[in-house]
UniProtKB/Swiss-Prot annotation:
This is N-acetylmuramic acid 6-phosphate etherase. It comes from Levilactobacillus brevis (strain ATCC 367 / BCRC 12310 / CIP 105137 / JCM 1170 / LMG 11437 / NCIMB 947 / NCTC 947) (Lactobacillus brevis). Specifically catalyzes the cleavage of the D-lactyl ether substituent of MurNAc 6-phosphate, producing GlcNAc 6-phosphate and D-lactate. Disulfide bonds: none annotated. Residues 55-218 form the SIS domain. PROSITE patterns: SIS (PS51464). Pathway: Amino-sugar metabolism; N-acetylmuramate degradation. The active site is at residues 83, 114. Keywords: Carbohydrate metabolism, Lyase. The gene is murQ. Its EC number is 4.2.1.126.
């Protein structure tokens, strides 16, 4: 399919007169179009769930979550990777984003970078991609050369390939192990895929990373438990998380945190199981750090 034939490049008849609308009418037009994004993403929920279920065992066993894209798609991937690091206590080696053109492309357009097949291969070769890794490749059009080449390279290495695009049956969708294709339709401003397509990508990446982290034991109940107390503020936050998770007092949470040497998951298991440090550590080791599984294992043993 020619680029100008793509749905993402078509004119939107609902916004043809946006340049003549009042400011309120203009933002109402944009808002109405944004409502279509959530519905489009909703149709992809089974595929998103399947991708999460395929990805989290790899991540849980040491695989890396790697985002790849060009332009807006690449920047959104870098952002998701960067944000989930402090949220779930990850390192920059466990999850990161690769964008066509490298770091300069985060703030400037790097000419021709998105068209380079060689650059994609070099970028993934440089991080020593393995079959244990997960590659999330995003391109609104589904045919960006850099992104396609990255996904092809990932397939050759045996890595899990998740592909986001907004065009049905795109080359990216056909190449991915798990294609996720919310068809959001033409943009309010013709071809400006930073709008609905970008919003859809942000929603999908949020779901993917959150789902993988939850399934990998980085969350207990709905609490971020991998907070690392490094100062007064984060120490207070850690105490509150422990207290809420275990329905205990802040004082009891503080004592458990001290016993656990500031390791929040260990402190939670200590309180929930009423065991010793050694027993709590053994439970976490047996469940690969999953707090909920550690608590369940303790219940079975007693």
């Amino acid at each position: 399919m020619q680029f100008d034939e793509l749905l993402t490049e078509q004119r939107n008849h609902r916004s043809t007169h946006i340049d003549r609308e009042s400011t309120l009418e203009m933002v109402a037009t944009i808002n109405r179009e944004d409502h279509r994004v959530a519905r489009a993403v909703q149709k992809e929920l089974p595929q998103i769930a399947a991708a999460i279920d395929a990805a989290y065992p790899k991540f849980d066993q040491g695989g890396r979550l790697i985002y790849v894209g060009a332009g807006t798609s690449g920047r959104l991937g870098v952002m998701d990777a960067t944000e989930i690091q402090p949220t779930y206590g990850l390192t920059a080696e466990q999850t990161f984003g690769l964008i066509a053109g490298g770091e300069p492309a985060l703030t400037h357009t790097v000419k021709a970078a998105e068209d380079s097949i060689e650059l994609a291969q070099e970028d993934l070769a440089a991080v020593q991609l393995t079959a244990q890794d997960i590659v999330v490749a995003s391109a609104a059009s589904g045919q960006t050369p850099y992104t396609l080449a990255a996904l092809q390279y990932a397939q050759e290495k045996g890595a899990l390939g998740i592909g986001f695009s907004c065009v049905e049956d795109s080359p990216l969708a056909q190449l991915a192990n798990y294609p996720i294709t919310p068809v959001v339709g033409p943009e309010v401003i013709t071809g400006a895929t930073l709008l609905k397509a970008g919003t859809a990508e942000k929603m999908v990446l949020n779901m993917l990373s959150t789902g993988i982290m939850v399934k990998s034991g980085k969350v207990y109940q709905n609490l971020m438990i991998n907070v690392v107390p490094t100062n007064g503020k984060t120490f207070e936050r850690a105490k509150k998380i422990i207290a809420e998770a275990t329905q205990t007092s802040l004082l009891a949470a503080e004592r458990a945190l001290e016993r656990a040497n500031n390791h929040v998951p260990l402190a939670i298991v200590l309180i929930e199981t009423k065991g010793t440090i050694a027993e709590a550590k053994a439970l976490l080791a047996a469940t690969n750090g999953h707090v909920s599984q550690a608590v369940k294992l303790n219940d079975k043993q007693h």
